[in-house]
Amino acid sequence: MMVAHTAQQLDLREKLLTNGVHSLSDIELLAIFISSGNNRKSCLQLAYELTKHLGNLRNILNADLQSFKSIHGLGEVRYAQLQAAKEICHRSDFIDLQKEIRLSNTQQTYAFLKKRLRDYKNETFAALFLDNQHRIIAYEELFSGTINTATVYPRPIVERVLQLNAAALILAHNHPSGLSDASQQDLAITERIRDALDLVDARLLDHIVIGDNEVYSIFAENKWVCN
C-alpha cells in the first residue's frame, strides 16, 4: 500500500514539473503539500477529506488546529507547516508593497490589508507606518479583541510612531461579521488617534475597514475626519 501511495505522490510531482503548478487541482496541490500519507490513506485521500471537511483552500488556510486535526492522519506538524507557508505568502506580499518608492497605489494597499486581516476570527487592529516620503517602514498588528470589538488605545500607537520615527500611518481593522461599513465607534477612535498623532507631528492618512469582500475608507467616505 505504501508503495502505491509513494508512486501516486511522485506522479503528482511529475505532473507539476511537466505541466506547471496551474495544471493541478486544489486537492492535488494539497496532496503535494501533505507529502505523505499513512498505512490506510494516501496524501491524495487526506487532501480530499480535508477539502470535503473544510470546503475550500481559504477555509483550510484559516482553520484552527482542532479542525485541521479532525482528519485522521493530519496533525500538528502539517498544521505548523501550513501556517508557515501562509505567513511566507503574507511576507512576500509585504515585500511587493515595500517596492513602491512611495505608497501611492491605493488598490495595492487595500489588497494587502484585506489579505492580511479579513480572515481573522477576532477583530484585529493594524497599522502601516510610513516615513516622510510615504515609504513603508513597518506593518504591525497592534490590538486584537473579540468577534465584535477590539479595544484600541491611542497612546501605544503614538509611542510606536516615535520609536519608528514614522511621519505618517494608515490604520486598518477587520470586521469579522464581513460588513465593511464603519461604525460610530470606528469614527470616534479615528478622531482620537488623529488628534493624538497631531501632537507629535505625525499624520494619519486613512483608516481602512476590512470586510469579507469590500474595504471601506473612513477618510474617503467621511471628509470631515480629515480636517
UniProtKB/Swiss-Prot annotation:
The keyword Metal-binding applies. A motif (JAMM motif) lies at residues 173-186. Residues 102-225 form the MPN domain. Keywords: Hydrolase, Metal-binding, Metalloprotease, Protease, Zinc. Pfam families: RadC (PF04002), UPF0758_N (PF20582). Zn(2+) binds at H173, H175, D186. One of its GO terms (molecular function) is metal ion binding. The keyword Hydrolase applies. GO terms for biological process: proteolysis. Belongs to the UPF0758 family. This is UPF0758 protein lpp2553. It comes from Legionella pneumophila (strain Paris).
